[in-house]
Amino acid sequence: MTASTRPTPPKLPRPQPAPLATSPTLDAVHQRLLKHPQLASQLQAQLWQQVTATPLLEADPTQEGKYLVTFLWRGAAQRVLLFVNRLTDEKNLADSYMRRLPGTDTWYLTYRMDADWRASYCFLPALSAAQAPWLQGSQVRLRQALDAGLPDPCNPVTCTNRRGFVQSVVSLPLAPAWPLGDWPVFSDAAAGAGSFDGGGLGAGRGDADAGRLNAGRLDVVADLDTLGRQIWVYTPAPISRTQSYPVLLVLDGEVWLKRHHLHLALAQLMDAGLIAPAYIVFIDSGGTEQRWQELGESNFGRYLTGPLLNWLKTHYAISPKPADRVVIGQSLGALTVLRTLVAYPQLIGAGISQSASLWQDVLFNELNALDATQTPLAGTRAWIEVGSQEWILAPLQPKAVHQLRKAGMQVKDMVYNGGHDYACWRINLASALMQLLPGPNALPGPGAYPAGNLS
């Protein structure tokens, strides 16, 4: 499959424009500058002294429970495009152009958002219209430009996107929270980056220097003859080979391991007793084209339940129970999660699907082929979530959930206020795992999804 032959996600405009608003603070400065342009330098300095953190958050004086979220950028430019995950409409970029305070180099744009919203964002300044990177070339070039924008220098909270670019993150007060506080940040050295691209079973390292009380082990496996790809297997400290343990199968593993150091974040949850100790297997996607080929219409579940699972059973003491085998994926990977549970419920019995690419018909075709009256998916469990800002995917999730439940699957159906966004997915993984593999202390964290029974 090539870029010219693979399926293309629908590119439809937002059904409603993003909720632009007016910040009282910025509007007051703007009006003063119009009346007193000679005070531009003074008023700009006063504004930046007043703004202690960005984006600027103000309670909406007109709508209770809403916030006015003002993004600020300072720098010489003829135009600045603000890219906010799933608020920026690629079919209507003009609505995301920032406004300039007259006579200054300060740019701003305000949205009215509910208090549980989270999103990654970045800035794309252009010194001239001809240099605007978002106006040069195809949809692919546009996507590349948006992904490679600049983070907010005044916001220390960041998230790395799939392509490896650092973006800033805005989280409003009621957004789901990581149970142990802020999302944990580890250095590459602490995460074992020096061994990420090593080879051979046992080419691992401890993570005692990662701020954890106990050390785990990361094995870098390059058994290409058997597995056909590189994988990484993390064994947390509480695990011993004297008994079997659950296993997490993480699709797009190179992103979660190298960009987000997910093994150490989940190890902290295990240490705290929030989720059960489990092996974490990071599965390399093989790159863009291979990912589209395998996680699209191909049957990647056959690989997960065949060569991979058989190899893991030989080398690690993984649980024989399908309920203890959890496959995790996002976007195309999330579609693969659901298809694997449908096709192989006797081998993998639990899954976390985040923003599944349900615009492809393949899952619905497979569900329609089931005899739902026999409840063939009884005993399987899934956490299925989508962002309310995902205007193409969100309307499709209820249909999938209905059909899966009809076939016997226990589904936790969740909608979060956000987009197609690692900044949201990484936080929500904690609640999903507390649901599917709860530890003795599995309680909802501040603002997190409740850890209750599946329905």
Predicted regions and their residues:
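Cap/lid segment of the alpha/beta-hydrolase catalytic domain
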Residues: 249-317
